[in-house]
């Protein structure tokens, strides 16, 4: 359904790519939200410390984004997620989980500390309860996977946690990976589209990815791995559900650039955070990134808009 790959040790740049796979399009919108933006979500209210560029899902919340400090966050589906009880004091919803982290934190270390006592509750999106876990990485190369299990947040925090997929929970994915070459087992590379197969395949190709000569090769390398775990339209899972890849993103945490490919368009677009004014008092801006006419740097094409969430 979704896969995230973080290439942190290539010697050129800290780069990440993720796929978005679902039954229907999540209608992504590209947002640039300045620091100092005020948000209210249930009992929680805050003012952002950092500017954020990234994607929303169904105008309900942030699914994939990077902030001006070089911290990125990605929500991926996790069917076995167990959130805190509804009405928990000071809770935020899963739909604003990634946004809350990016608004408050500059590093993975800060995020892990801030999330320690934060209750996260489930809120429906278009009538669906969507279990999810949160992948984080920063410009230092640090990484964390945060999963709501039995009402508590379980944190896996280490730079080597570079690959995330969906179910089962992350610790079980790591155990499954050990059955395959070159991770301690003797099984050959799997070719299916199930979450466990995608996890192994992404880890395998990342293990063998050659050092890039420059930034272009670094971005191309991590995106090529995302391509190996993308799902074409029509291909069924074991449960006969069809969850194609709707888009792929990439984040250059070293140079603060956010890339986007819609799988209904042949073109790549990107936003340079250094070229957009994210200071307090500047307007929130947005762009529909699925327009087939878009190509290249679209930083200047974002226009003022009202936040729907």
Locations of regions flagged by a protein language model:
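Catalytic cofactor-binding cores of redox enzymes
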Residues: 117-153
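Compact, glycine/acidic-enriched structural inserts
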Residues: 31-47, 79-120, 282-293
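A short, polar/proline- and glycine-enriched secondary-structure boundary/capping micro-motif
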Residues: 25-30, 83-89, 155-160, 165-167, ...
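Short hydrophobic/aromatic-rich beta-strand segments that constitute the beta-sheet cores
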Residues: 73-75, 155, 258-261
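Short acidic-glycine loop/turn motifs at beta-strand connectors
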Residues: 8-12, 67-69, 138-141, 147-152, ...
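A contiguous strand-loop segment
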Residues: 1-90, 296-301, 308-309
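Short, surface-exposed beta-strand-loop junctions and turns on beta-sheet-rich folds
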Residues: 22-24, 79-81, 151-153, 264-268
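C-terminus-biased signal that marks the final domain/tail of proteins
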Residues: 1-13, 112-114, 123-124, 129-130, ...
């Amino acid at each position: 359904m979704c896969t995230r790959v973080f290439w942190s040790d290539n010697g050129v740049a800290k780069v990440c790519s993720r796929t978005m796979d679902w039954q229907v399009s999540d209608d992504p919108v590209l947002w640039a939200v300045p620091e100092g933006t005020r948000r209210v979500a249930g009992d929680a209210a805050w003012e952002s410390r950092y500017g954020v560029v990234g994607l929303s899902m169904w105008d309900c919340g942030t699914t994939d984004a990077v902030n001006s400090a070089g911290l990125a966050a990605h929500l991926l589906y996790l069917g076995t997620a167990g959130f805190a009880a509804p009405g928990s004091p000071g809770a935020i919803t899963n739909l604003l989980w990634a946004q809350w982290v990016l608004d408050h934190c500059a590093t993975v270390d800060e995020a892990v500390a801030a999330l320690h006592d934060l209750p996260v509750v489930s809120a429906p999106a278009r009538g669906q309860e969507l279990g999810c876990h949160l992948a984080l990485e920063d410009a230092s190369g640090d990484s964390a996977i945060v999963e709501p299990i039995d009402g508590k947040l379980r944190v896996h925090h280490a730079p080597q946690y570079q690959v995330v997929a969906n179910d089962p929970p992350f610790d079980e994915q790591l155990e499954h990976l050990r059955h395959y070459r070159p991770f301690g087992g003797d099984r050959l590379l799997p070719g299916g589209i199930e979450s466990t197969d995608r996890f192994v395949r992404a880890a395998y190709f990342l293990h063998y990815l050659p050092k890039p000569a420059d930034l272009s090769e670094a971005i191309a390398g991590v995106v090529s791995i995302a391509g190996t775990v993308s799902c074409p339209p029509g291909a069924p899972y074991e449960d006969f559900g069809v969850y194609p890849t709707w888009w792929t993103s990439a984040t250059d945490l070293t140079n603060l650039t956010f890339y986007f490919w819609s799988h209904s368009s042949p073109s790549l677009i990107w936003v340079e955070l250094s070229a957009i004014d994210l200071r307090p008092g500047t307007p929130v801006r947005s762009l529909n990134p699925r327009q087939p006419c878009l190509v290249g740097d679209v930083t200047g094409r974002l226009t003022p808009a009202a936040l729907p969430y």
